[in-house]
Structure formats: structure tokens, C-alpha cells
């Protein structure tokens, strides 16, 4: 009798373990692509312009900044933050990254460090880290589920071509991203930031998060991004992503 009980419990445990590991990383990625609108619709978006408000939250209180982000396939990105007539710019054209930092008293464009350039390049793709990850030089592992604010989210480890690592959490019912944890090297020290996604809305048939809350583990402060307007496949000049060339240099 004892042998039968042990056998039954063993079979139950085996069934539970099999169910927990039945899904693969590639299956989850396919479900995520379908949930967002489908791989074809995602690939059809060649440019994306997002506008909204970015709130910085810290010991100083909070400050709202006008925000705009431009992305162009395959991997160009430019973000702008504007307040009191001054605009902070960060851009990546697929080869090099640069910035304009008027709030630090630097109004001329300057090239970004290698670590900062990698971080910007990691987020440049319109389709995100999961879609066509092999073509992007990444590796992905499925790590099971993890509790995210009461939700048993699917956890994927993304080893990026840059050497940085991201952990992406997918909602178990809708398979959309609800959180990412990015681990990156900054001047020889590992930096970790968390982004929580919500308020998904369609742009040209593809779902994008219109609310992104970020938290930096190293005490860099929190941000809340709210997208108010989105446009896809509008013409974007390559020059807006490239390092500006002064008139005297032409």
C-alpha cells in the first residue's frame, strides 16, 4: 500500500513539474508577438514617433518634462526631454551614440561613452528585444515563473549582443510585457533598473505600452512616462539620428 501511495505522489509531482516546464522560450515569444498584433504587423512598422510627459521623481520632489521619442528601423533612436525652453537629446544611428546636455551646461553635441552607447542601442529596435532575437545576436532562456505584484509572470532571460542582460516578464494570460529588469555595466560597475509597463494601446494594429514607470536600483531616481500621442510610419530623416556636423566642418 505504501508503495502505491509513493507511486501516486511521484506521478503527481512529475505531472506538476512537466506542466510547469511545458512551455518554451520560443513559444512564449510567439505568444507575445501574437498578443502585440502579429509578427507581420510589427515588421510593417518602419518608424515610430511617441510624444508625452516624463515625470522625474526624487528627493527634490518631482518635475514634468515634455518627452518625444523617434525610432527608425532597423535600429536608430532619438529621445528628447524639454523643459523651460531647453532640450536634452540622446540619439543612436546604428553606429554611434551622442547627446546634448543643456541642463549640465553642455549645449554642444558630444559622443556618449561606450557603456551609455550600448544601453541606448539595446533599446533602439521598434520590435523590442524578443522579436527576431537570434538575428539581433541575442540568446534567450526561459526561467519559469516569478511573482510580480501578485501575478505569476513568465520570466525570460535575454543575453544581449552588447553583453548586457535583461529579464523580461510576460503576463501569463495576455503574454504582454509587464516588467523588464535591465542589468548593464556603467563605468565598470553593474547598474540595474526596473521598468513596469501598462496602458497598452494600438498603433497601426500593434500594441505598445503608453505607461512606463522606471526605478533605478543605484538611487538614480524614478520616472513615470505617459504617452499622449503616437504615430507610425511617418517619414523620419536619417540626419536626425546622426551626430550633427557643424557648418564650419562642411
Segments the model singles out, each with a brief description of its role:
Residues 1-9:
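Bacterial N-terminal signal peptides that target proteins for export
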Residues 8-17:
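Bacterial N-terminal signal peptides
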Residues 18-22:
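Sec/Tat signal peptide C-region and signal peptidase I cleavage site
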Residues 26-105, 137-144:
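N-terminal mature ectodomain segment of secretory-pathway/periplasmic proteins
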Residues 86, 149-244:
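Gly/Pro-enriched, hydrophobic low-complexity segments
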Residues 98-127:
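Acidic/charged, solvent-exposed loop-and-adjacent secondary-structure segments enriched in E/D, K/R, S/T
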Residues 119-157, 176-179:
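Short, conserved active-site entrance elements at the starts or edges of catalytic domains
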Residues 249-250:
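Short, solvent-exposed mixed-charge patches
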